[in-house]
UniProtKB/Swiss-Prot annotation:
Binding site for substrate: 233, 349
Gene responsible for this protein: drdK
Descriptive protein name: 5-deoxyribose kinase
Keyword ATP-binding belongs to the record: yes
Annotated keywords: ATP-binding, Carbohydrate metabolism, Kinase, Nucleotide-binding, Transferase
Assembly notes: Homodimer.
Annotated Pfam families: APH (PF01636)
Record keyword Lipid biosynthesis present: no
Protein role: Catalyzes the ATP-dependent phosphorylation of 5-deoxyribose into 5-deoxy-alpha-D-ribose 1-phosphate, as part of a 5-deoxyribose salvage pathway that recycles this toxic radical SAM enzyme by-product to mainstream metabolites. Is also able to catalyze the phosphorylation of 5-methylthioribose into methylthioribose 1-phosphate, but this enzyme may not function in methionine salvage in B.thuringiensis since it exists a paralog (MtnK) present in the methionine salvage pathway cluster. Does not act on 5-deoxyribulose, 2-deoxyribose, ribose, fucose, fructose, fructose 6-phosphate, and glucose.
Amino acids binding ATP: 43, 60, 113-115, 250-252
Enzyme nomenclature, EC number: 2.7.1.-, 2.7.1.100
């Protein structure tokens, strides 16, 4: 009798038994091994492999609380959302997400392609690796998954069915708290401030009423603007890379929201990589080459996104009023404003809030870390307060470089 007819959190030995029962190609495998490899905040991730037979899979299971904190009570439905979204994204952006082999609504888990021959992008960037096709792949992914799930392209009734299918209240609440509220109010007393910057943050983040007003506006846009199906957590820890391949993973935060949320997350996390390199690499040609590539990548993320977005609009638009001359540019500009604001929000929340990024925390020299944080926080305020001024990739990068040089003076 199967032991997998009632939900429980699996251990490695359970996962081996699970794949042997559920996946025919593993049924008679003799040398299966399993290791829990998850380092995220929410789920349990296992790699199962048979070296002799050269086959492997990933098993991802959802618990009913977040790993980051038991305070976050979560619906295990998020794994259903993730499985569904990955399959949809594979239709919209083929080859840019892992394949899903199985979803199990009883065990609240899914089985998917093993990407062990790739590296987590955040880790690769901290190690100062270069991936020439990164911007091209990420912009293709974002344009195809965002524009093609919007009212511009989809039948409106079908789009509303997707909105209903991807209602994701528990994970949206995490974003509403950790991105749009707590970094500016600390009302839940969970913020973690680096001591050298604590005074500056209290004066220039917590006490800035103009900033808080702009964040309030963006929060309500996030909660009410069901523009497109977002990945919802598109940082560099949600991307696997190798020289010839990019794979976007972990869309468990997916829901219908403003497109710029995904684009802004990508931009902010590339900036974390930039300040990390600025703080940790010794001066010289290697540092110059790497930081130049990061700057070019940031420029291309915005500029390629714009070009591909308008090209895809011309090909796929179905909404009659969206065909009005010039409306595509107006629509795109609103996406870019959201992008700038979210870039700022992500920069602030990862420094002030509960969920840190290794790009910052691994900077061992305290003065260098304080400098990196302040560069991020200062450019973040500009992105939020002057979001309508950021229309090109170069405008983002110039603000980052100017703040870095200003800090050095």
């Amino acid at each position: 009798m199967s032991k997998f007819t009632k939900y429980f959190l699996m251990e490695a030995s359970d996962v081996i038994a699970y794949v042997k029962e559920k996946l025919s190609k593993f049924e008679h495998a003799k040398g299966l091994k399993c290791k829990e490899i998850g380092d995220g905040n929410l789920n349990y991730v296992f790699r199962v492999w048979d070296k002799k037979e050269n086959m492997s899979v990933i098993v991802k299971q959802a618990g009913d609380t977040a790993r980051i904190s038991d305070e976050f009570k979560l619906s295990t439905n998020r794994i259903r959302i993730e499985s569904d979204v990955l399959q949809l994204e594979n239709e919209l952006a083929p080859g840019l997400v892992p394949k899903v082999y199985l979803f199990d609504s009883v065990m609240n888990c899914c089985v998917m392609e093993d990407l062990s021959n790739h590296t987590i992008l955040r880790t690769a960037l901290i190690n100062h690796q270069i991936f020439p096709q990164l911007a091209d792949d990420l912009t293709t992914f974002m344009v195809n998954t965002l524009l093609l799930t919007s009212d511009v392209v989809m039948n409106h009734k079908e789009k509303k069915e997707l909105v209903k299918n991807y209602i994701n209240p528990e994970l949206c609440e995490i974003t509403e708290d950790l991105v749009y509220s707590e970094p500016f109010t600390n009302h839940n007393k969970r913020n973690e401030l680096f001591p050298l910057n604590e005074g500056w943050i209290r004066e220039h983040i917590y006490s800035d009423k103009e900033l808080r007003m702009e964040v309030a506006k963006r929060k309500f846009s996030f909660m009410t603007n069901a523009q497109a199906l977002l990945h919802g957590d598109l940082h560099t820890g949600s991307v696997f890379v190798r020289d010839d391949s990019t794979k976007v993973i972990d869309p468990e935060f997916a829901f219908y929201g403003p497109m710029g949320y995904d684009v802004g997350n990508v931009m902010a996390n590339l900036m974390f990589a930039w300040v990390n390199a600025d703080a940790t690499m010794p001066p010289g040609a290697e540092k110059d080459t790497y930081m130049d590539w990061l700057q070019t990548t940031m420029v291309e993320v915005i500029d390629l996104f714009k070009k591909k977005f308008l090209d895809a609009w011309d090909i796929h638009v179905t909404e009659i009023m969206a065909k009005e001359e010039g409306f595509n540019e107006v629509y795109l500009q609103s996406v870019l404003e959201d992008t700038a604001a979210v870039t700022g929000l992500e920069l602030i929340r990862r420094i002030v809030g509960l969920a840190k990024v290794k790009d910052i925390t691994c900077i061992e020299n305290e003065e260098a870390r304080a400098r990196a944080e302040q560069i991020c926080l200062k450019v973040a305020k500009s992105f939020i307060l002057r979001a309508n001024q950021y229309r090109t990739g170069r405008s983002f990068v110039e603000t980052l470089k100017e703040q870095s040089m200003h800090y050095a003076e």
